[in-house]
Curated annotation (Swiss-Prot):
The lineage of its organism: Eukaryota, Metazoa, Chordata, Craniata, Vertebrata. Residues 19-376 are extracellular. Residues 1-18 form the signal peptide. PANTHER family: FAM187 (PTHR32178), IG-LIKE V-TYPE DOMAIN-CONTAINING PROTEIN FAM187A (PTHR32178:SF7). It is a single-pass type I membrane protein. Residues 267-361 form the Ig-like V-type domain. This is Ig-like V-type domain-containing protein FAM187A. Disulfide bonds join C289-C345. SMART domains: IG. Residues 398-418 are cytoplasmic.
Length: 418
């Protein structure tokens, strides 16, 4: 009978030893660093956030430093490090247009860049404080300006491939997003980024397919890059219809609702949180969906009217006053009284938020340089004064030149009097 406790004890001790072995196992021991530094090519769309893992490092290195170069061999190298304690935990903390030094974070040896811009394209190195590099990336951030949208419901197809001798330029599409709405007709889409195939690419760049890299890769020679600059990213859109998942209302809210209903009044219970905003008549407004990213399936409704991308996507009509940009933001230019209402936001097929917009034509609002309209008015006023000053000085200079030619005895004192 004493063998049973001994057996259990030995089994437990063996399990602890096995657990200790697994605990000490290091992922970097299974991934040796390359003897010759190469660059892993990757591409993203502007305003996206991306992560670059440091796939290998020596076992004795406890912390990594990320470096950035615009071009290989550049004399200017940016050091990306969080040794000063500056960490960005959420992309919501990052403002649009801020410097990359305010949009990155290092977590578990990986570099995270939020809301990437085309200026962030370049080479990223994972290394140490002493400048020893272990792993490197060739990152291509493609701008969504000039993005071509194709609507399958209208029979439109993506852009055809382009051939220039041995150069093959084409579009590589991401996976389809989920349907942006449920219970009603919705839309889904997928982004397409520019890629090329050519046998004369640098062997230092790792390619997913043989001789294939993104169009903005540093492996592409300048002559080939000029031929690809007109092949912009694409957006393919099609209709979809999915059913909604049943969402059970909380027991507490349901009890209050039933109690008030028995008293004779049925209260209005909003399906999603609603935020109120009051806007001045004639001014612009941009509404963002909470927690949404450019790669998410985001939809907008005004009250019960869906705002489909086939009609409201930016670029469909140049004279559009209300449109949705490629970053899933809703723009209202020159707000009118008819814009009053509740604007609902869908994210990944779920309605998550509402914005009640009120438009007022009365009241005085203090001018602020943070207001785009105020900045535009100040800039136009300064430009007007500058033009008037230039014209004034030009007229007087011409007058002085004419008088000096016609009257040789025209003295400098007379010029000063003018």
């Amino acid at each position: 009978m004493r063998l049973a406790p001994t057996t259990v004890l030995l089994w437990a001790w063996g399990s602890l030893q096995a657990f200790e072995i697994v605990e000490k196992e290091n992922i970097f021991q299974r991934t040796p660093c390359p003897a010759f530094l190469v660059f892993d090519n990757t591409a993203y769309l502007a305003d996206m956030s991306f992560e670059l893992p440091c796939h290998c490092k020596p076992e004795d290195v406890s912390a990594v430093v990320w470096y950035y170069q615009k071009y290989l061999g550049s004399s200017h190298t940016t050091v990306l490090t969080d040794f000063d304690g500056r960490l960005l935990t959420e992309a919501a903390h990052v403002r649009v247009g801020s410097s990359m030094l305010a949009r990155f974070s290092i977590r578990m040896f990986s570099l995270l860049v939020f809301r990437a811009q085309p200026e962030d394209s370049g080479l990223y190195f994972c290394g140490t404080r002493n400048g020893d590099y272990f792993y490197a990336y060739d990152v291509d951030i493609q701008s969504h300006k000039g993005m071509v949208a194709s609507f399958r419901d209208k029979g439109q197809e993506p852009l055809p491939d382009e051939y220039y001798g041995s150069l093959h330029v084409f579009t590589t599409f991401w996976e389809w997003t989920p349907c942006d709405r449920c219970g009603v007709r919705g839309e889904q889409w997928r982004f397409g980024l520019c890629y090329l195939q050519n046998p004369n690419l640098s062997p230092r760049y790792i390619k997913t397919l043989p001789d294939v890299v993104s169009c903005g890769s540093r492996a592409v020679p300048w002559k080939l890059h000029l031929k690809t600059k007109y092949h912009t990213p694409e957006l393919l859109i099609q209709s979809c219809l999915v059913s909604c998942k049943k969402n059970k209302m909380g027991e507490g809210i349901l009890a209050i609702y039933n109690y008030v209903s028995k008293l004779g009044g049925r209260p209005w219970v909003p399906q999603v949180p609603i935020q109120f905003h009051q806007q001045r008549l004639g001014h612009g407004l941009i509404i963002s969906c909470p927690g949404a990213r450019p790669e998410h399936a985001v939809a907008w409704d005004k009250d019960s009217q869906p705002l489909y991308r086939t009609q409201y996507l930016k670029g469909v009509n140049r004279s559009m006053r209300v449109f949705i940009d490629h970053g899933n933001h809703l723009h209202i230019r020159f707000t009118q009284l008819s814009d009053r209402g509740i604007y609902y936001c869908w994210r990944q097929g779920l309605k998550i938020a509402g914005f009640r917009l009120g438009v007022t034509s009365r009241g005085r609002y203090p001018a602020s340089l943070s207001d785009p309209e105020t900045r535009t008015a100040v800039e136009l006023t300064l430009i007007g004064y500058l033009l008037i000053a230039v014209v004034f000085v030009t007229i007087h200079l011409c007058r002085c030149c004419c008088q000096s030619r016609c009257c040789p005895n025209f003295s400098a004192q007379t010029l000063l009097q003018l």
